From Swiss-Prot:
The gene is queA. This is S-adenosylmethionine:tRNA ribosyltransferase-isomerase. Monomer. SUPFAM superfamilies: QueA-like (SSF111337). Belongs to the QueA family.
């Protein structure tokens, strides 16, 4: 299975840099079996069935993008930092630009209330130890940081105050992600309430999405690719809700690939169980899904592991047809783009 099997041409004009307003005005490509319909997210109330269960990732994106100053003697250098994940040795793993201007032991000052020491420096990233922890760190980061927009958006514009709302789900609870579970950005409170009134259930899980979600696949044989690890949790109550839905014949529908990867990790034994820890599950064609019946997700990058995941769910030829339709009909792609609802079979 070759990386080139997952390539496609995407016009740059289809890369969304702002979300639809309101959130539910985003377009929705409904693909059920061989059928494709052009709908909108607001139509989900008539698409989902009573007894369906949506699995939502309630992670909260932290303002992980920082700009600071490194002082060496009388020389100063402007440093841009993106936090990636908490480091096992303490502090945070981070990317920095320009990395070459930093040495272990040096301090980066981000604000009067927040500084960090370069504890370790690798070839592509570093480990930072901040001068604050706990609630004090969270408060200082909130003041000094900005939303860590994906590279394909950040290359086109800088983050602003509007992203603080746009790049956060309405049910975000547990801080720790440095990228949003973007399929969930399409939901607002009125839509959630309308779905609940229809008899659709909701289960919340937590997967702290890491910056590794944007890393390219660098091997031609995709089966040899190794995924980045991300921390997640499926509580006992969440596992019980999902199991009860399966037992009753309802559909389990993750909203986003992060929720899907987490519940499939928790069902590695064949049945969904409470689960907590790091997952590096890599889903590509040939994978046998254990609890997922359908998936709501945005449109993904060429040659990405997420495109491989949806190809595993729907089949490679079917995904090619779906993405060809999306491009021809001007669907907006990636994090702030439109959505798809992928239902195998039909």
């Amino acid at each position: 299975m070759q990386l080139s099997d997952f390539d496609f041409d995407l016009p740059e004009r289809l890369i969304a840099t702002r979300p639809a307003r309101p959130r539910t005005a985003a377009r929705l490509l409904l693909a059920e079996g061989d059928r494709i319909e052009d709908r909108h997210v607001r139509d989900l109330v008539g698409i989902f069935r009573p007894g369906d269960r949506l699995v939502l990732n309630n992670t909260r994106v932290i303002p992980a993008r920082l700009t600071g100053t490194r002082t060496r003697g009388e020389a100063e250098a402007r440093i841009e930092v993106t936090l990636m994940e908490p480091a096992a040795a303490g502090g945070w793993r981070a990317m920095a630009k320009p990395l070459r201007k930093l040495k272990p032991g040096e301090t980066i000052r981000f604000s009067d209330a927040l500084s960090a020491e370069v504890a370790e420096k690798g070839e592509t990233d570093l480990r930072l130890v901040f001068d604050r922890a706990g609630a004090a760190f969270d408060a200082a980061l909130a003041d000094a940081g900005a939303m860590p927009l994906p590279p394909y958006i950040a290359a086109r514009r800088a983050p602003d105050a509007q992203d603080d709302e746009d790049y956060q789900t309405v049910f975000a609870r547990h801080a720790g992600a440095v990228a949003a579970p973007t399929a969930s950005l399409h939901f607002d409170r009125p839509l959630l309430e309308a779905l609940a009134a229809r008899g659709v259930g909701f289960t919340e899980v937590t997967l702290h999405v890491g910056a590794g979600t944007f890393l390219p696949v660098k091997v031609e044989d995709v089966t040899t690719h190794r995924m980045h690890a991300e921390w997640g949790e499926v509580t006992e109550a969440a596992a019980a809700e999902i199991a009860a839905t399966k037992a009753a014949g309802g559909r389990v529908i993750p909203v986003g690939t992060t929720a899907l990867r987490l519940i499939e990790s928790a069902a590695a034994s064949g049945a969904i169980r409470p689960w907590r820890g790091e997952t590096d599950i890599f889903i590509y064609p040939g994978y046998r899904f254990r609890v997922t019946d359908a998936l709501m997700t945005n449109f993904h990058l060429p040659k990405s592991t997420l495109l491989m995941l949806v190809s595993a769910l729907m089949g490679q030829e079917r995904i090619r047809a779906i993405y060809d339709h999306a491009v021809r009909h001007d669907y907006r792609f990636f994090s702030y783009g439109d959505a798809s609802l992928l239902i195998p079979g039909g």
